[in-house]
Amino acid sequence: MRGDERIQDEMFSCVTLEQRVPADHPLREIRGLTDAVLGSLNAEFDALYAASGRPSIAPEYVLRALLLQAFYSVRSERQLVEQLDYNLLFRWFVGLSMDDAVWNHAVFSKNRDRLLNSEVAQRFFAEVNRLAKRFMSDEHFTVDGTLIQAWASQKSFRPKDGSDDDGTNFRGQKRSSDTHRSTTDPDARLYKKSYGKESKLSYLGHVLVENRNGLIAAAMATTADGHAERDAALLMLHQRQKRGSQRVTVGADKAYDTEDFVATAHELNVTVHVQKNEKGRRSRIDRRTTRHSGYARSLSRRWLVEKTFGWLKGTGPLRQVKLRGLAKVDWIFVFSCAAHNLLRLPRLLATQIQQDPQPQCA
C-alpha cells in the first residue's frame, strides 16, 4: 500500500541529537578525545575573558567548530555557521541543541580572533600529543616544509619606496621581497620552492613527523625564504631535545644537506639522515652515516611527511590560508596539525585494542 506524503511539519520532536548520531560514527570517538583536551585548557580559557560583561561564544564551541571546518573542508566561517544551522551532526559535535540559535558569522570570527591572539593552539596541540604519546616514536623523525599560499594577490605587491606603481601591470619588472611588500599582508613573501614554478606570495609551514605512525611531533609556520626550512627544523629539534638527551635521527630531503644544518644537528645529539645532494658540490653526509641500515630506513619513511602535507592542504585549510599575518598563520597551521593527529587517534586506539585484548574473566 502506498503511503501518503505528509506536508505538515511536526510541532514537537521526541528524538534527541544524541539519538540522531549513529553509535559507530567516527566523530563520536573524536568528540570524546576533544572534550578531554578542552577540559585541560580551562585555565587558559579563563585568562582570555573578563570576569564581568556580556558572555561570549564559549571557546569550546569555537574550537570544535574549527575542527569541523578542517575535517570537512568547509571553505569559510560564513559557510561553517550556515552548516551549523541545519546540519544536525555539526550541531551535536559542537555542543548545540536542536533549538539553540546559531551565531552570526561576523560574531563567530571575532570570537575566533580572540583565540588567535593567544597560545591556545600550541596548548591544544600539546594536549593532543599527550594523548597520542604511546603511538609516537621518540627516536626517529622526518622533517620537511611546505609552501602555504597567502591570502593576498600579486597586485598588492608594491615597491617599498612608495612609488606610484599600482601593481596592476608588472610584466617585465624585476620584483623581490627585498624591494617590494604586499600592502594586504606585509608578512607574506614572494617565493617559490622549486625551479619552473611561479613565485607566489607565501608562508612556509614546517612539521617534524615521527616515523612510527606519521603523527606530527612539532609544527610551526614562518615567513618564506631560502633558510627558513633548515632554521625551523633546527628550532623544532632543539625544543624536542631539551625534553630528552637521547640521540635521535631525522630524515629530510636534499635541501637540508648543508654544512651548517648537519653540524648544528650533531651538536643537538641528532643523527642526520638526509638525502645526499651531490649536484655540483660535495655532500655533507659521508659513509659513516650511509653505511648503516637505519639511513636507508629513514629515507624510506619520508612519504609519511608528504602524506601529512597532502591532508593539511587537500582536506585541511592550508592550501591557501585565509588569515593574514604570520602570528595568525602560525596559529591556524599548528591547530590544523592538532586536527590531523586527533583524526588519526581513534583508528590507532582501535588497532591497539585489537592487538592487546583485555583478558577475559573465568
Name the predicted role of every residue range.
Residues 22, 26, 53-61, 76, ...:
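Secondary-structure capping and boundary motifs in well-ordered enzyme cores
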